[in-house]
């Protein structure tokens, strides 16, 4: 009578036009898939936002010198004499006055109270030397003033200020036995440094009785071969046992580790929800077929084939899944995109970042929804195509 394609189109249009008469079954299928897509997008946007923050940290022309074998600043250590050897090594750029562009630094963990949680969390307190400001990409003092060397004063990153109490410029905050004055707030283009507090490295040494020691030496290298030249010079020096990193690569590697951990925790949850969404779609489509059994039987009796009937039912499931996916993605976009949070990074301090719901992520969410709709619609489609026409018509 009709070609199978024409029959499928006609049946699919009929099925979709009847959806307003079946709001319950449609809502069950869509809500389950929307929940799946929302959680899926939420997990991925968390990992994406963290990676964006970490990947935006660091400069290709800045080298980090850590003790050999150290994968984080916390487990690195230099004496003051070793830091001076590094400071004057070949391959390091010099400023207009001929001084090496180097900042020997300390990375310390202190506790601050979260604004939303009201509980203490680890925050990075970094001691820097005067050159440390200029070595940071996109550094800008946004409010107040920089700390005065030799005093117990801090400048705080925008992210740290937004997440923790007591970090407004002009306020004082106590870490251990020492009270610090917050003198200003800085920005670094949304990088991980905005989660830190900065002070004079010599004051930090004194406050925690750390002696004349440092954990990392940050240096701007001289030209494209500067880092290689620095690495070779330090490797040949018997007084040192160090690794030389590109600052950008160092933070990029840290981002991969933490993002993988987030995905490893979140994706199994998404998979479990996906299984639940498949069953929700199955139930909804079976209920739809049961409610329209006589209608489908009549269509079969007047000449519509089994294959177009099955395909039209499958298309209905996919359309419902698509609508649920769009709904879930929309909820994720409006609720999570740009949402600020913090997590414990490999440095054992809180890193503040914004969730990033990207177009690529939304596309992956829609694809996941369509897969669920396809899987959830196969068996109901087969049932619709194989139902006994005579049995259904007897009920008329």
Label each residue range with its predicted role.
Residues 286, 291-340, 364-372, 380:
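Transmembrane alpha-helical interface segments in multi-pass membrane proteins
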Residues 1-38:
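N-terminal Sec/SRP start-transfer signal
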Residues 23-50, 259-295, 318-327, 371-375:
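Hydrophobic alpha-helical transmembrane segments of multi-pass inner-membrane transport and secretion
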Residues 102-109, 119-131, 136-203, 210:
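Hydrophobic secondary-structure segments that place a key small or acidic residue at a functional site
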Residues 46, 50-53, 189, 223-279, ...:
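Peri-transmembrane interface segments
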Residues 358-396:
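C-terminal membrane-exit region of the final transmembrane helix in multipass inner-membrane proteins
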Residues 336-363:
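Short juxtamembrane loops and helix-capping segments at transmembrane helix boundaries
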